[in-house]
Amino acid sequence: MLTHKIIGLDVGSKTVGVAVSDLMGWTAQGLDTLRINEEENELGITKLAEIIKKEDADTVVIGLPKNMNNSIGFRGEASLKYKEELLKILPDINVVMWDERLSTMAAERSLLEADVSRSKRKKVIDKMAAVFILQGYLDSLQ
C-alpha cells in the first residue's frame, strides 16, 4: 500500500493527459486532460499542481518518449522541460521519467477495439495514454 497516490502524465504539444493511482498502487485511472500551448509556454503547471495537492500525490510519473534506438528526440526533450517547470512550482515532488514508447499507440488500439468513435477517441486519447504510462510504472513496483 502506498502512503500517497501517484500521478501519471502524457505530455503532448497541445494537451497533457493526467492519470492517478489508487492508494494500493495497483491501478491507474484517467483523471483529466489539460489544455496547454507549448509555443506560448502555457504548460498548465498551476492546474497540475492543484490536482497533485487535491489527490495527495507525492510522485509524478512523466512519460518520456524515446526513439526506437533509445535516443531522446524532440518530444522527449519537451517532456524533460515539463519536468523542470513542474519542479520549479513543486520542488519537493518526486518525478520519475518513464519510457513511454508506444503507449499512445497501445491506448489508441484499445480504444479502437472498444469501438470508440473517432471524435470520442480524440477527447480521451491523452488521458488514456497517461493511464498506460502510470500502469506500466505501477506494475514495475510489484
From Swiss-Prot:
GO CC, alphabetical: cytosol
SMART domains per record: YqgFc
CDD domains: YqgF (cd16964)
Main localization of the protein described in the UniProt heading: cytoplasm
GO BP, sorted A to Z: rRNA 5'-end processing
InterPro entries from the UniProt entry: RNaseH-like_sf, YqgF, YqgF/RNaseH-like_dom, YqgF/RNaseH-like_dom_sf
Class of enzymatic activity (EC top level): hydrolase
EC number: 3.1.-.-
Record Gene3D superfamilies: YqgF/RNase H-like domain (3.30.420.140)
Keywords per UniProt: Cytoplasm, Hydrolase, Nuclease, Ribosome biogenesis
Localization (cell): Cytoplasm
GO molecular function terms noted in the UniProt entry: nuclease activity
Annotated function: Could be a nuclease involved in processing of the 5'-end of pre-16S rRNA.
Similarity comment: Belongs to the YqgF nuclease family.
Record protein name field: Putative pre-16S rRNA nuclease
